[in-house]
Structures are given as structure tokens and as C-alpha cells.
């Protein structure tokens, strides 16, 4: 689906090698055409250095979100410009290879999606444009920077989406780097054109005029800028007429110049009421882990209520939260099992969907950005083995559970606050599964994440960080069958790295007392 490439690390890795192949093809073309333009040769050398670094450790390279964005941008925009240049002096070999590879290239929508992912990281983790542009991110192996053109591309993406907040941030960064002397194909005039209009959209008329005047000083023939400036001047004159005077009068009768706050623009509110709480938890802020609560959390060995399979080798169990009770189990999956699960899942990965509460139809949504696939026990013995292990740990039957769901969160991958259970206003949400509502969630972490990617619960202020080989477990319903609305949770955007998890949601078609009525299967911590 367009716009989702950045959410899948495996597919992005393929692009690394595709780009490397193109570089080799380009070098062969240069050798065949010794009189080739020096501009193309320079491009090839630059790409050769870049792809040599990226192919030496593709996953590590793509762990840096700036690298991932620039890869998509290069393949969608920069290589197209090069193709046009080469076509001026056509050589069949290189063009044929490029044409073949282009069918696998990112699209305009993919580049837009990658840019929006960077903006999502920028907002969630309170990173200014300067930090992202300079590549100063925690846990990164490769330092990668954004050029003036890259920053301009980010700003233009935001502008085309009607997002003037990010337009201002990124056009300002592009202008700053341009003013510092960085070489750029994009001109200051182009940057100022976008920036002045975006600033005007925030109602900052004085700064819009200032930026427009600067644009005109660089290009006095710019018709739109001249027209805009005249329009701004008329608006300002109208404002002054309505006020009756240029200066505001205070209560003492003295006059003061009206204060204009330039450049301080607030991020617009959106559809998510708990946005601030959710994003703060993603940053590790506002976690309500008090000393009193900490004293109620313990570690123990868990044998599944004396399950014969676990008596000899019980699992290490750690309380993550007291109410609702959330626990973490250690060494649930081995590295070999994790790699096998990922191997089975990768060919089937597709954009994760959500159920539209109004229509009941599965659809993609901007608040869930990841790739997922579903595994059955018949797919491989390891699936049945992992399934059985989760049943032994939780005491919940696998027969009334969804298939194993593997999720891959790449650059900016996230799942905003949501419930795992069906609410009363959507009683048929799980009808297609032939089971019932989702009793509990067993979430296996199949990777460590260098930065970001926490599982957070905005209602009670908990944040749980991924640890490879561990799993967290909680109940979504009370024993009465009523949903526990406190369990609304989210998968925070991945800032640096790649996140893999394996999700198992147990379901019930009847009252939960019957679901766990079999002796020895009732989890000890389930509370009404």
C-alpha cells in the first residue's frame, strides 16, 4: 500500500541492496562512456560511498530514522533527476537497469509517509528540527544529517498536507542551514515563499511581511511575493483602522507598542484527547511509579499453578504494575525461536489494519503504523510450541484465541491508544473470528529497541519497555465479562531501531468463570 514502506524494516533493507545494484550499474555505464559528464561521475562516487556503508550493516544503518527517510527520498526524487540527466545522452545499459529497478522503487506517497514518520518522532519525543537535521539521536550507530534540500522536502510535505506547524519548523531549518553557507540546489527564494505563507496562516502578519520583503530583496521580479506583500499591507492597514490607532492603550492612559510574538507557534490539537499524556509516557515522563506502589511489586518463579510442564523449569515472573495487574515473564522465547518466527512472518507482512467502529470493516489507519502477519500452528512446529508455552503460563485455553500475530514496527512505527477488547457499542467486532471478546493479552517482545517503542497505559501512567525474549501479560476484562477500560494502551513510535513483537489475545464466547473453570488453570492474579 502506498505510503507505508517506512513501517517495514525488511522491505527497506531490500531497497538498500537495490540502491547498491543501481550504483554498480551506474559505474559500469561511466566506464563504458569515458566522456560522461563529470556531474554524473561525481554522483556515482557519492552513492558508492553511501551504499558501501549502508550494505555493511543494513539493519544498523536503517535503525537511524534519518537514514531511512533519506533512502526513500533518494530513490523517489534524486534518482529520477539523475535519470533525466542520463537520458540527455542515452546509454541503454544503465537506463534498462534503472527502468527494471524503478518498479520496486518507493513512490511519492512512500516519501510522504517517511517524512510524516520523522515528524511523528519529532512531536512525540520533543525533538527540534535542528536535532533531527544534525542526526543527534540516542543509540544510533551511524551519524546522518539532513541537507537544505532534505529539510525543504520535509517542509513541503507538511505544506501539501495543510500542516503549517511543521512547514514553519522545517522551512526555518532549511533557511538556517542555507544562511550558514551550506550548498543547496533549492534557493532561499523558494524557502521564503513557503515559509512566509505558512507564518501568515498562523496569523503572524508582521513576520509574514518581514519574510516576504526578504524574498523580494532576493528576487524583485517574484510576482506572487509582490502580490502577497500588497495583500498583507492591506490587511495590516485594515487592522489598524479597526483598532483606531497603531498603538494599544493601557489602563493608565499611556501607550505601548503592540507586542508581536514571532516564531512561537503552538502545535495544533488533534483527535486524541490523551495526546499529551501518551507522548509524555513515551518519553519516560509522567510514569506514576511511586515508592508505595513499588513496594507492592515483586519477583517470583511462576509454575502455572503447578502445571506439570513448569514445575521443573518455572518462568521468572516480575510485577510491572499493581492495578490493573501487569506482569512480565522472562526467557519466554529463545533467540532461535524468535528468528524462526520472524522468518515465517516476513513474506506475509502487510500493513496492519483496524476495525472501523462504524462500518465494522477492516481498514488501515494513520494511528496504527506497522506491518503484521498471522501464523497458525500448522505453519511450523515452533508456532505450536510457542502457543503451548503461552497456554501453560497463563492457564487460558488456546482454542479460544486468535492466531499468533507478528508485528514489525519500523521508522516511526506506532499504535496509538486503543483497547484490545470490544466495547458495548461494537458487539460484533469479533464475530468473524467465531469466538468472543478478548479476555487477555500476552505480548512477546522479539527485539530490543535502541530508543522509543514502549508500551504505555495513559489511564494509570505506566510505561513498559521492550526487552527481547520477555513477554508481558494483562487481563482486558473483569471476570464478569465487563471491559477494564484502564487497559487502554499504546505502542509508542520507534525512535531508533526496529521493533518486533508477537501478540496473542485470548478470547471467550461465554462467562469468564466458565472459561477458566478447569482445575489448576486459573491465573492467580485475576481480580474482579
Which residue ranges define each predicted feature?
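Fe(II)/2-oxoglutarate oxygenase catalytic core
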Residues: 1-473, 477-528
